[in-house]
């Protein structure tokens, strides 16, 4: 995903989003049904609770079709012009950044015909005050939101200059009566969602969900007569559906997309990918490490990271659509290069080909070219494989470490480095990359295998509620125009809880970051670099790739899509931007 909108937004103490142009539609309905597929491999269940990460609305990324955010941030535009008023028409900071006062849009109705107002917003923030419902990592609130006339004031324990996207852009507003129930029971099933969004549920089946225009929508009539979101098992099946005209908009890695789709009819078939996050290898650092051995040590995690050939992942697993991550800081580069240390120590220090890091960076890190894995593990107290040798300066174990022959494996205290990579088979790119990681690390003396999840639901349920069920996994990042968004997730937010990672220094640096005026770079940059150093040395996550905002679409039915020449919004068919994009499209006559 791509979250680049915040850099220009966070340097101001107040911002009236009502001054920005409202981009909604006044179309007359009648356009043909638009078929959208945000992701593959989701097992449908009739649950549209936006605060249950296992609901079909969450799994498919369709929350904002019904339950809207307060502000729509154009994640490709870091200026105030990229801030679009939605259910809030304005906001401003107070109390040194600890309070955010929202002006709530008037004359809005829910899709059941009832009136929307400030009380619904306040009730929604009571939902995210429950840690079990706070799936997006909204910072801790000091007290309940207060309502005065047409305003709602949110009260936080710490300044929130860095958290606008999470607080205002990813909190999906519920009707107060529903919000009160979800606050008490965050995983309650919502079979028929009530919201203010442009669409409402038309019909549900285990293979297809249909959405119809909300006749009460405050933003005008949606241009589409219907939105269909089908259950598609694999990326290959999505490719077939695009080619046959059974799919108009896909948000996943389509194999050989140009050959298999775009080039068949370049006038209507399109693909545009923008790098907007850091894909990492999650390490299970919960007690027991899911049964893995070795990954509880930072030296082993660093060696794993340095041993991965990221170019192979980018070119083979991602078909060249995503770039190899080049910095162990996990910053999104080159977008965030200004935050890197001036000495160049964390620039291009990761292996992107042939298991060898950039020579200059390797020297700065005191890692001789071609000996990175060897030195890291040897210095960490691990004994090299008995069969190991150096071939043209590159360490090799002498054979694959597969657990059956410890002569090919690094050992320490009678243990070898042993773990599996757990990802959904329907995510063909991740699954291919899991296999590549196994193939790359076994010759380096680590017993690495793959473990399949049969679908997203199986995989996500294991990640969120069964820490003994996985050891490592490939996972996308939260993105962000500023480093804070991903770092918060990794060090203190949802991801940190899932992998079991705690670091007091990281928490302190995040607190300092959130309290710092973004224009005060003399204070800000050293603070961010503390987080970079923690990521680089402790390696709770190994950066792999710069994640693409998957976006493959057909203009045969509708025009007005975001593209490289008109990048008005993160283009992926997912929330929160999905509904915004749908309201900009124009039917082809």
Which residues make up each language-model segment?
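Detector for C-terminal structural segments
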Residues: 29, 208, 213, 307-351, ...
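N-terminal lobe/hinge region of extracytoplasmic solute-binding protein
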Residues: 37-95, 194-195
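Gly/Pro-rich hinge or "lid" segments in bacterial periplasmic/extracellular proteins
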Residues: 56-57, 74-76, 168-222, 226, ...
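Aromatic- and charge-enriched surface segment that lines or borders ligand/interaction sites
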Residues: 89-133, 147-153, 238-244, 293-296, ...
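Surface-exposed binding/hinge segments that line
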Residues: 95-96, 101-103, 136-181, 556
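Extracellular/periplasmic solute-recognition and catalytic clefts
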Residues: 128, 134-137, 144-146, 202-212, ...
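Ligand/substrate-recognition segments at binding pockets and active sites
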Residues: 206, 336, 356-366, 370, ...
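Local pocket/hinge segments that shape ligand/substrate recognition
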Residues: 254-403, 497-504, 538-555
């Amino acid at each position: 995903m791509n979250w680049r909108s915040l850099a220009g937004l966070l340097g101001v103490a107040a911002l009236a989003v009502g001054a920005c142009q409202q981009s909604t539609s006044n179309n007359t309905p009648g356009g043909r049904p638009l078929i959208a597929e945000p992701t593959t491999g989701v097992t449908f269940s009739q649950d549209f609770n936006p605060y249950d990460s296992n609901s079909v609305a969450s799994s498919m990324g369709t929350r904002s079709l019904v339950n809207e955010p307060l502000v729509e941030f154009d994640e490709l535009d870091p200026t105030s012009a990229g801030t679009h008023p939605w259910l809030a028409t304005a906001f401003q900071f107070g109390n040194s950044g600890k309070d955010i006062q929202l002006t709530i849009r008037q004359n809005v109705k829910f899709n059941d015909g009832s009136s929307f107002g400030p009380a619904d917003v306040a009730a929604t923030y009571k939902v995210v005050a429950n840690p079990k419902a706070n799936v997006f990592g909204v910072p801790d609130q000091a007290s309940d939101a207060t309502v005065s006339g047409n305003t709602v004031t949110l009260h936080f324990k710490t300044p929130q200059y860095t958290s606008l996207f999470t607080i205002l852009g990813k909190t999906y507003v519920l009707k107060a009566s529903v919000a009160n129930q979800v606050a008490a029971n965050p995983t309650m099933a919502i079979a028929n969602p009530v919201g203010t969004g442009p669409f409402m549920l038309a019909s549900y089946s285990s293979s297809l969900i249909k959405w119809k225009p909300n006749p009460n929508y405050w933003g005008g009539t949606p241009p589409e007569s219907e939105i269909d979101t089908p259950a598609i098992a694999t990326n290959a099946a999505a490719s077939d559906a695009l080619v046959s005209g059974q799919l108009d908009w896909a948000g996943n890695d389509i194999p050989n997309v140009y050959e298999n789709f775009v080039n068949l009819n370049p006038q209507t078939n399109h693909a545009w990918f923008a790098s907007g996050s850091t894909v990492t290898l999650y390490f299970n650092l919960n007690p027991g490490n899911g049964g893995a051995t070795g990954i509880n040590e930072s030296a082993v995690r660093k060696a794993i990271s340095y041993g991965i050939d990221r170019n192979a992942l980018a070119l083979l697993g991602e078909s060249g659509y995503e770039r190899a991550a080049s910095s162990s800081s996990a910053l999104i580069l080159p977008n965030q290069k200004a935050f890197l240390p001036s000495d160049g120590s964390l620039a291009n220090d990761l292996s992107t080909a042939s298991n060898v890091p950039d020579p200059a960076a390797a020297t700065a890190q005191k890692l001789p070219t071609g000996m990175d894995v060897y030195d890291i593990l040897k210095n960490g107290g691990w004994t090299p494989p008995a069969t190991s040798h150096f071939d043209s300066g590159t360490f090799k174990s002498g054979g694959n470490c597969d657990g059956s022959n410890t002569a090919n494996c690094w050992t320490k205290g009678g243990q070898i480095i042993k773990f599996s990579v757990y990802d959904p088979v329907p995510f063909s790119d991740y699954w291919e990359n899991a296999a590549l990681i196994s193939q790359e690390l076994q010759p380096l003396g680590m017993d690495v295998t793959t473990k399949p999840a049969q679908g997203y639901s199986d995989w996500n349920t294991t990640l969120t509620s069964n820490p003994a069920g996985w050891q490592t996994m490939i996972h996308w990042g939260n993105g962000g125009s500023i480093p804070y968004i991903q770092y918060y997730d990794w060090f203190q937010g949802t991801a940190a809880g899932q992998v079991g990672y705690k670091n007091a220094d990281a928490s302190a640096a995040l607190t300092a970051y959130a309290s710092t005026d973004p224009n005060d770079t003399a204070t800000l940059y050293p603070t961010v670099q503390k987080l970079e150093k923690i990521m680089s040395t402790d390696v709770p996550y190994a950066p792999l790739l710069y994640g693409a905002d998957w976006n493959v679409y057909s203009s045969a039915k509708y025009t007005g899509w975001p593209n490289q020449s008109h990048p008005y919004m993160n283009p992926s068919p997912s929330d929160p931007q999905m509904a915004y994009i749908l309201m900009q499209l124009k039917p082809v006559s």
